[in-house]
C-alpha cells in the first residue's frame, strides 16, 4: 500500500485573491468592465459572481464584456465594494454606512449587509457595573497579502470592517467609569487603569492619565471587534448604548432577490450563515476564557442571544438614504424618513398592535431596495425564526400530505406584514404573499430535515437514550435537530445525575436498550415526501438544554414508544413560553 503525501499551504485562498486583486489594479487578465456613471471598473467575472448574487444572475447566459449599473450607484462606493470582493475588507467613514449598505443590498452582497447592520444596530455588553474596551490581538490573525495593515495607516484611516474574516481572539482591558483627581507632579492617581499584565496588553491611556493630559473621566462605552476605535474615529460620540433587540436568526438566511433563478436561495446561503454563527459562538467562548482580569466559571453557561458580543460603533440617528428614497418614494413607514434612534419601536401598521424596531425595519428596506417580494421575506424572517417557520404551515393552506398538526403563522403579525407590503407595492397580490410564506416554511423544514442524520451521527453514544429517560417531558419531546454547542457539558451533567440517581433507573437504562426512531415517518414535524439532501450547512439555531431533575425528585418512568403527544407545541401561546420564540405578544 503506497504512502499518501499531503501538502497544505496556509492562507492559499487569500494569497490567490491577493494576486487577482493586484492583476485587477494593473488591468491584467480582466474579462469584464462595470460602468458606473461613465467610469469603467475592470474586474474578473468569477470573483464578482462568487461575491454577488446580482452579478451572478447578470452574467448568467450573457457574454458581454461591459455592463452598466444604474445611476443611483455612486462610483466611489462601488469602488470600495469591488475592493471588498477581492480582499474581504471594507473601509468607510461613519457617514457612508447607509450608502454602502444600500449599494451592497442592491448588488446582493450578503456579508456587507449583515455585518454592516451589526455595526449600526446591535449592542452587546450585558454588564451594568463596568464596561470594557477591547483591543485586537495583532498576532492572532494570519497575515496575508490581502489583510496586512500598516500601523501608521491604521491610526489615520477610518474603522475597517472584515465580514469574511473570523473574529480574532480578543483581549480584555477593564475601564472603570469614575472621577479621577488630577495627579500632581510627583503623585500617582488614586486608582490607575488596570492594564491586565497577564494578557500582555499595554494601554496608552494609562500613561496619558498619569501625565495629566487625558480627560479625567473615563467613558463608559465598549467597542467589540474594532481595534482602538476611540482613536481611529477622533470625533466619536462616547456615550452608552442601551440594550436593544436582536434581529431574528432567520433574517440572515433569506435571499435579496426575487428572480426565478434564485427563488430558493435560502439553502444556498446556509453555509455562509452557519459558518458566521459557528465563528461567533466559538470565539465568544474563547474570549471569555482569555479574560485574565475576571473570574470565569469552569464551565460557562451558553450565552443568550441578546447578550452576545458584537460591534458597537456609536448611537447615530438613522434615516433612509436619499438615494433609496429617490427610487422607492414615500411608500415606507413615515417615521423612516426622519432621523431617529435605531432601537425605537415603531408600529408596523397603524392600529395593528405589531411593533418592530426602527433598525430592523430599515434593515429590511436596505436589503430589499425596490423589490417588494424581498421586503416580504425580510419582514417575515424578522418576526419568525427558522424553527417557527419549520413548525408551521405558512398561511393555513395545507396539502393532503402535510402534517395536520402544523398550525398557521400568527395571523395578527402575518396580516400586518401583508398590509405593509401592499402599501409598499399596491400590485402585490395576497395569493403571491401566501405562496412566498409557504415557500419559506418548506425551505426551513427541508434544511432541518437535511441535517437531522448528520446531527444524530455527531451525538455522543447514548445521548438518545438519556434524552428519552431523563426529564419529565422526555416521552413527548423528540431529539431536537438543533443540538446545542454545549452538548458535551450537558451530557456529562446527565451522567453525573445518573450516578447519583436510583439504582433501579441505572438498571433500566443499561438493560432496556431503547432506540429513538428519527426517520420522517416517526417525526411528524417533517414531510414524508421530502428527500434528504447530501450537502448543506450547519444548523444555526440552538435549542436550550433540558433542565436536570432536582435531587429530591423521583426518577422518571422509562420511555414507552406508544405514549406521548405532539412533538412540538403548536399554538402561539405555547410558542411564547419557548426561549427560542421570536414573537410573543407585542414586539
Curated annotation (Swiss-Prot):
Alphabetical list of InterPro entries matching this protein: BEN_domain, BTB/POZ_dom, SKP1/BTB/POZ_sf, ZnFinger_BTB_dom_contain
Places the protein is found: Nucleus
Compositional bias ranges of the Polar residues kind: 245-263
Molecular-function annotations in GO: DNA-binding transcription factor activity, RNA polymerase II-specific; DNA-binding transcription repressor activity, RNA polymerase II-specific; histone deacetylase binding; protein homodimerization activity; protein-containing complex binding; RNA polymerase II cis-regulatory region sequence-specific DNA binding
Top-rank taxon, per record: Eukaryota
A single BP term in Gene Ontology: negative regulation of DNA-templated transcription
Matches recorded under CDD domains: BTB_POZ_BTBD14A_NAC2
Biased amino acid composition, Low complexity: 567-576
Keyword Cytoplasm set for record: no
Domain BTB positions: 30-94
Gene3D superfamilies linked: BEN domain, Potassium Channel Kv1.1, Chain A
Cross-link Glycyl lysine isopeptide (Lys-Gly) (interchain with G-Cter in SUMO2), where in sequence: 174, 217, 299, 429, 456
GO cellular component: a single term: mitochondrion
Keywords: Isopeptide bond, Nucleus, Repressor, Transcription, Transcription regulation, Ubl conjugation
Ranges for domain BEN: 351-448
Region Disordered: start-end pairs: 240-272, 542-587
Oligomer and partners: Homooligomer; mediated by the BTB domain. Interacts with the NuRD complex. Interacts (via C-terminal part) with HDAC2. Interacts (via BTB domain) with MTA1, MTA2 and MTA3.
Cited function: Functions as a transcriptional repressor through its association with the NuRD complex. Recruits the NuRD complex to the promoter of MDM2, leading to the repression of MDM2 transcription and subsequent stability of p53/TP53.
Official protein name in the record: Nucleus accumbens-associated protein 2
Organism: Homo sapiens (Human)
Amino acid at each position: 500500500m503506497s504512502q499518501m503525501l499531503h501538502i497544505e499551504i496556509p492562507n492559499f485562498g487569500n494569497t490567490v485573491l491577493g494576486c487577482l486583486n493586484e492583476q485587477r489594479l494593473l488591468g491584467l487578465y480582466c474579462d469584464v468592465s462595470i460602468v458606473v456613471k461613465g467610469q469603467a471598473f475592470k474586474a474578473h467575472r468569477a470573483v464578482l459572481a462568487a461575491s454577488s448574487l446580482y452579478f451572478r444572475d447578470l452574467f448568467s447566459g450573457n457574454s458581454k464584456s461591459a455592463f452598466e449599473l444604474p445611476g443611483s450607484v455612486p462610483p466611489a462606493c462601488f469602488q470600495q465594494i469591488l475592493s471588498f470582493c477581492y480582499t474581504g475588507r471594507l473601509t468607510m467613514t461613519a457617514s457612508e454606512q447607509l450608502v454602502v449598505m444600500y449599494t451592497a443590498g442592491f448588488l446582493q452582497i450578503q456579508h456587507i449587509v449583515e455585518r454592516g447592520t451589526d455595526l449600526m444596530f446591535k449592542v452587546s455588553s450585558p454588564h451594568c457595573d463596568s464596561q470594557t474596551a477591547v483591543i485586537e490581538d495583532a498576532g492572532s490573525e494570519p497575515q496575508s497579502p490581502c489583510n496586512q495593515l500598516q500601523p501608521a495607516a491604521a491610526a489615520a484611516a477610518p474603522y475597517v470592517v472584515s465580514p469574511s474574516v473570523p473574529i480574532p481572539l480578543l483581549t480584555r482591558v477593564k475601564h472603570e467609569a469614575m472621577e479621577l483627581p488630577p495627579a500632581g507632579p510627583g503623585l500617582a492617581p488614586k486608582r490607575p487603569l488596570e492594564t491586565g499584565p497577564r494578557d500582555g496588553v499595554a494601554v496608552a491611556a494609562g500613561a496619558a492619565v498619569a501625565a495629566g493630559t487625558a480627560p479625567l473621566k473615563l467613558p463608559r462605552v465598549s467597542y467589540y471587534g474594532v481595534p482602538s476605535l476611540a482613536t481611529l474615529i477622533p470625533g466619536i460620540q462616547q456615550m452608552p448604548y442601551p440594550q436593544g433587540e436582536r434581529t431574528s436568526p432567520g433574517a440572515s438566511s433569506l435571499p435579496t432577490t426575487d428572480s426565478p433563478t434564485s427563488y430558493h436561495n435560502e439553502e444556498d446561503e446556509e453555509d455562509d450563515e452557519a459558518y458566521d454563527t459557528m465563528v461567533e459562538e466559538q470565539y465568544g467562548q474563547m474570549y471569555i476564557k482569555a479574560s485574565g482580569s475576571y473570574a470565569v466559571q469552569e464551565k460557562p453557561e451558553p450565552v443568550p442571544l441578546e447578550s452576545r458580543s458584537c460591534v458597537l460603533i456609536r448611537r447615530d440617528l438613522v434615516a433612509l438614504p436619499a438615494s433609496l428614497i429617490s427610487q422607492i418614494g414615500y411608500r415606507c413607514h413615515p417615521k423612516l424618513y426622519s432621523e431617529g434612534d435605531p432601537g425605537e419601536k415603531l408600529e408596523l401598521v397603524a392600529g395593528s398592535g405589531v411593533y418592530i424596531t426602527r433598525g430592523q425595519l430599515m434593515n429590511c428596506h436596505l436589503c430589499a431596495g425596490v423589490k417588494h417580494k424581498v421586503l416580504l421575506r425580510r419582514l417575515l424572517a424578522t418576526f419568525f425564526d427558522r424553527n417557527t417557520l419549520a413548525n408551521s404551515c405558512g398561511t393555513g393552506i395545507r396539502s393532503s400530505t402535510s402534517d395536520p398538526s402544523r398550525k398557521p403563522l400568527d395571523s395578527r403579525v402575518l396580516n400586518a406584514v401583508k398590509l405593509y407590503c401592499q402599501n409598499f407595492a399596491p400590485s402585490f397580490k395576497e395569493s403571491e404573499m401566501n405562496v412566498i410564506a409557504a415557500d419559506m416554511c418548506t425551505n426551513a423544514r427541508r434544511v432541518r430535515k437535511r441535517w437531522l442524520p448528520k446531527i444524530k451521527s455527531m451525538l455522543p453514544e447514548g445521548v438518545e437514550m438519556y434524552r428519552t429517560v431523563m426529564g419529565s417531558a422526555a416521552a413527548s419531546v423528540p431529539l431536537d435537530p438543533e443540538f446545542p454547542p454545549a452538548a458535551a457539558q450537558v451530557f456529562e451533567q446527565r451522567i453525573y445525575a445518573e450516578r447519583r440517581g436510583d439504582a433501579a433507573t441505572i438498571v433500566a437504562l443499561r438493560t432496556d436498550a431503547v432506540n429513538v426512531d428519527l426517520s420522517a415517518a416517526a417525526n411528524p414535524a417533517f414531510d414524508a415526501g421530502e428527500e434528504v439532501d447530501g450537502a448543506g450547512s450547519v444548523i444555526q439555531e440552538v435549542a436550550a438544554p433540558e433542565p436536570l431533575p432536582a435531587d429530591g425528585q423521583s426518577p422518571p418512568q422509562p420511555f414507552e414508544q406508544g405514549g406521548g403527544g405532539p412533538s412540538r407545541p403548536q399554538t402561539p401561546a405555547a410558542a411564547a413560553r419557548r426561549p427560542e420564540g421570536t414573537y410573543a405578544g407585542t414586539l
